[in-house]
From Swiss-Prot:
Protein name (database record): UPF0349 protein SERP0525
Lineage, opening ranks: Bacteria, Bacillati, Bacillota, Bacilli, Bacillales
InterPro entries: DUF1450, UPF0349
Family: Belongs to the UPF0349 family.
Lineage: superkingdom: Bacteria
Annotated Pfam families: DUF1450 (PF07293)
Length: 81
């Protein structure tokens, strides 16, 4: 089972789409896009994604991508690394 990373389409329009596309090309991660993840305050203030249900944030797309991989590693989420 691979880590699941979920994105809000509104947040993707603010820049997390770059991260979505990079993760979509990683065969060891499952990614999903939703219309809304019900985190509107967070969505308005930063880039974020849900990683196996946990909120992971970043100030830039590169920060978000780095933080997602770090969260996966720190939490030993399956066989990614």
């Amino acid at each position: 089972m691979f880590p699941l990373v979920e994105f809000c389409i509104s947040n993707m329009a603010k820049g997390s789409d770059v991260v979505f596309e990079k993760l979509e090309n990683d065969p060891n991660i499952d990614v999903l896009e939703y219309g809304c993840l019900q985190n509107c305050g967070l969505c308005a203030s930063s880039l974020y994604a849900l990683v196996d249900g946990d909120i992971v944030e970043g100030n830039t797309p590169d920060d978000l991508l780095k933080n997602i991989y770090q969260h996966i590693e720190d939490n030993d989420i399956t066989n990614l690394l």
